[in-house]
Amino acid sequence: MEPLTIVSLVVASLFLFAFWALSPKTSKNLPPGPPKLPIIGNIHQLKSPTPHRVLRNLARKYGPIMHLQLGQVSTVVVSTPRLAREIMKTNDISFADRPTTTTSQIFFYKAQDIGWAPYGEYWRQMKKICTLELLSAKKVRSFSSIREEELSRISKVLESQAGTPINFTEMTVEMVNNVICKATLGDSCKDQATLIEVLYDVLKTLSAFNLASYYPGLQFLNVILGKKAKWLKMQKQLDDILEDVLKEHRSKGSNKSDQEDLVDVLLRVKDTGGLDFTVTDEHVKAVVLDMLTAGTDTSSATLEWAMTELMRNPHMMKRAQDEVRSVVKGNTITETDLQSLHYLKLIVKETLRLHAPTPLLVPRECRQDCNVDGYDIPAKTKILVNAWACGTDPDSWKDPESFIPERFENCPINYMGADFEFIPFGAGRRICPGLTFGLSMVEYPLANFLYHFDWKLPNGLKPHELDITEITGISTSLKHQLKIVPMIPKSIAK
């Protein structure tokens, strides 16, 4: 170990001990929670590949609203629909802020995006632009040709590999990345491969354990250990690529195609003005990074889980394939066909319920002292909503940890944020604005995979033997990538 690293750790240890010894004892009526260790509090209880399950298990013992001390960060976790409603509806404005983190400040241009920006007028106006201009249902439909073109390419690749195992996980990640990059940046990103590589490094960084996140006084460790320099280098790589994209879009001028990508929209809004603040290139780049980071991991993970559950339940696979093959006329699926694929939509909803793409929603921060369920929540408290625990709440769902798409038949519950037993995209002011876009990247590809191909497990593997061990980063995915065998069905073989 380097001498500088040893000195840093010694200084950090002394700081932590001093913090623990001198911390005042609160007299507030905080929610109950597990016992806290000296100095670290409850940090050790979140060091798990599946923290949403750990927190659900703790909530069963200590209650649906629970207090954890994560280093210096006072944290409240809610794990039932009733308490989620308290946070995201009843007291939504009190919990509309985001905690400030070093990484969000670096990667998202001082948190000038939509996901990490503090609650206020800037965030409200940018969210409005996002909702009305960038990710409206009409705008998402306008990208249908991009999705269709990419699925056509994927289908040809699968046809050429029919009968041999393919890595379904890698394939869907590539597909989702291609669509999101083209819809966001158009054809002008010459460095897409580098961009995607750096984006995944950013996602890993955002979800990685960082001691200074729990002890703000230890930010110097990020400098001494070289982490901050590494993050700044990554941000510079992203900025250089996005700067080239903006220059390319501006150089097109009146020669632009009829298809407006999201950068076109943001530059148009910037040039038009009419807001209470001046939109800068940094604002544009921050929002573009939101689009790129928010959709890539979550959409591909949802597709992976949906196909995994169908491989584990062959009767569901057959029912879904029978439906799509009876609805589609010709050899091409259009997005209008999706409206008639009722069972497929049930499969997607059940996948989102049981395998919430972000099981612990993006953290919120309490803006002011308030009271929830009889407990004091001090200002600046970090709030975690366990969306997965809400989606598997036994008081809300029968047999909650089983995959049963039929539970949504004739069921009015949906994922739009009004039903707190089902909040894969969040709810309230901070609900994910990319909900419609994200769904388009799951339903349409899944319909294509089920229509054009039959599927089997490799090497004689039985459905119940398929490993469904989870691992959590930004989203929760399979620990071991899904490898399956595409086969061209006789009914549509050429």
Swiss-Prot record:
Membrane topology classification: Single-pass membrane protein
One Pfam family here: p450
Main location: membrane
UniProt record, GO biological process: sesquiterpene biosynthetic process
Single GO cellular component term: membrane
Keyword check for Iron: yes
Top-level taxon in the UniProt lineage: Eukaryota
Cellular compartment(s): Membrane
Cofactor: heme
One Gene Ontology molecular-function label: costunolide synthase activity
Keywords: Heme, Iron, Membrane, Metal-binding, Monooxygenase, Oxidoreductase, Transmembrane, Transmembrane helix
Catalyzed reaction equations: germacra-1(10),4,11(13)-trien-12-oate + reduced [NADPH--hemoprotein reductase] + O2 = (+)-costunolide + oxidized [NADPH--hemoprotein reductase] + 2 H2O
Chain sites annotated for binding heme: 432
Protein name, UniProt field: Costunolide synthase
Organism expressing this protein natively: Cichorium intybus (Chicory)
